[in-house]
Each structure stands twice: as C-alpha cells, then as structure tokens.
A protein has these predicted regions:
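Phosphate/dinucleotide-binding and metal-coordinating scaffold of catalytic cores
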Residues: 1-250
C-alpha cells in the first residue's frame, strides 16, 4: 500500500519497504516466528484443526494478540473498534493456568485469539490496578503468565529469582511477580506494551530470526541458526548499536 510506505514502518529488517510484493518464502519466516513451537504447536494444531505447517491459517485463527504491534485478521475482517476485557479472580486465573497443558494458549475457546512464540506454556493477560483481566478477541495484554515446566516443578521460583537477581545487578529486565495461584505461575510485564491513561499501546518488535529472515527450524545455533557475531552485526541497524551490543552481552 503506497500510503503505508509513506507513513508506516517496515514489519521487519528482512522485509524492507519496496513497491514489489515479497514472495511467500521470504515472508514465511517472519510470520512463522510469531507462532508457538514444537509440542505446543502440535497440540494447538489438533485443537483448532489446522495443519502445523499452515502458518497463515494458524495466524488467522489465533493471531489476534501477537508479539509486537501486529494483529492478524482474516481477509475482510476489521479490527475491533474498542478492546474487550473480562475481569477475572485469582482463582479463575489459576483455573486458566491449569488448562494450559491440555489447551495451550487456551486455543479453540470462543473469543480467544492469542499467539506467543516459544516452546513453553504461557498466556497473555491484562493486569491493571492490581486486578486481572482476560483480553478477548485479540485485545492487547500487558503481562505474560508462565506456569512451571512439565516435570520441572520449581521453574516458576527459579525463573522469577533469576529475573529479580538480574534486576538487582543493574540489568534492564521486566518486572516479575510470583502469583498466588494453583498451579503455581509467575507474571512478567511485557516490554512490547505501554500502559497509557486510556489505552494499551502495542510496540512493534521482532526477534533475531525474524530480522534475519530465518525460519523457526534455524532458531538455534547448533541447528544452523545465528551466532553471536551475526547478532552483533545485525545490531548495526539500531539507533545506538554500542548500547544495544552491550545489552546483548549482559
């Protein structure tokens, strides 16, 4: 769209502005990296009855609230004019967390369109004024809830402790809080959301694989993914490369 090229922003370093459309192979890596991985994707696939390899079908179904500033809609659908939220209790939040092993991202439930990358169970939630709200139909969230990893029951405490320790050491890390839920879970504030007086603003972001145009299968260095040098080189595109490279090291 010419208007978007004039006033918008590129979705990715790997998808710079240009008049000609990109082919499917070039765009696939960016969108595939918005989706969950491994066993989580396999379970979601069964719940929504869409093939694991059908990236765009997945996003059409669950891509309402993704990482960054994107909301993926089916052709012809329009964004919500007003976000919708359901206030929930801590007990109800625990019930939602307990569903995740069987229903990752709560996929397949009416009004639920959530997608987060990674191989661990998690769900986005909105937390305002010490109250929890469930974001319906892809409304923006503010935090991410992470339960313990299967067979590793103390990961909640371990991950939260490491985050607090990093913050105490002066590192720039999001706020975390262990929740009084059963099963146990902790909450981390989203760095790609800004809470404004009357709204929640999405901040666009991408990971290294998206910025380099690499598929999910090449996320890890031992599987052909980027190493430290490639990541350092990529940060030359940032406004302040030296600071960002220092942050990467820590």
């Amino acid at each position: 769209e010419p208007a978007w090229i004039e006033s918008g922003f590129p979705l990715s370093l790997s998808l710079p502005f240009r008049q000609e459309p990109f082919d499917e192979e070039t765009t696939r890596a960016f969108f595939d990296n918005l989706l969950p991985e491994q066993g989580i994707r396999a379970k979601v696939s069964k719940l929504i009855q869409i093939s694991e390899k059908n990236v765009y079908g997945f996003l059409e179904t669950i891509g309402g609230e993704c990482a960054g500033a994107l909301t993926i809609l089916a052709d012809g659908d329009k964004p919500q004019s007003k976000p919708a939220y359901e206030k929930i209790s801590t007990q109800k939040l625990g019930e939602l967390v307990s569903l995740l092993p069987r229903r990752p991202l709560l996929a397949g439930q009416d009004g639920v369109r959530l997608s987060l990358a990674g191989a661990q169970n998690k769900i986005p939630i909105t937390y305002l004024d010490d109250q929890f709200f469930f974001p319906a139909n892809g409304s923006p969230s503010t935090h991410i809830i992470k339960p313990s990893i299967d067979d590793l029951p103390e990961t909640v405490e371990n991950e939260a402790f490491c985050m607090v320790l990093a913050k105490t050491a002066g590192m720039n890390v999001p706020e975390v809080k262990i929740l009084d839920t059963y099963p146990s879970a902790y909450m981390v504030k989203r760095y790609d959301r800004v809470i404004e007086p009357l709204s929640i603003k999405r901040i666009h972001q991408e990971d290294f694989c998206q910025a380099m145009g690499l598929p999910v299968a090449q996320k890890y260095q031992n599987e052909g993914g980027p190493g430290t040098k490639q990541c350092f080189d990529l940060l030359a595109h940032c406004e302040n490369p030296e600071n960002d490279r220092a942050s990467l090291l820590t």
